[in-house]
Amino acid sequence: MKKIETGAARPETFPEQWPGQCEVFSHFEYACGIPSILYAVTTYKENGLGNVCCGAWASFPGDGGGFYALVPLPASTHTLANIRRTGEFCVNFLPVRHFDALMRTVRQNGMEDDEFTEGGFTPEPARTVGAPRIAESFLTLEC
């Protein structure tokens, strides 16, 4: 395994993916942001259809006061609107074999798309919140 080594200056091995990327974000965010396990935040859309928002970059810290899911969720997403509307969601952790299925939910995520169906996932009721869980997940946080 090759170690990533970087200093204050952005190394040439970290090319910008879009103009000005490393002016907005530090190259350290890419060097230190190790991909985590696949997860998907699930909610119901306002029309009752399933919403699946996949991710692989997050932090799940905890202390005596609680356990927290720190996930990037842009303001323009259905997911954030759904969470603001209901106050409920699930964080579903999935094996890597579900990566392609999660990518289908990214490509088919309109208001009229049931993203569980698009990804081939089985929705199941959560035990403590009104948001749906993904039955194929090996761990779900109900929030």
What do the predicted segments below correspond to?
Residues M1-N51, S59-E142:
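Active-site-proximal mixed secondary-structure blocks
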Residues G55:
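Core nucleotidyl-transferase/polymerase catalytic module
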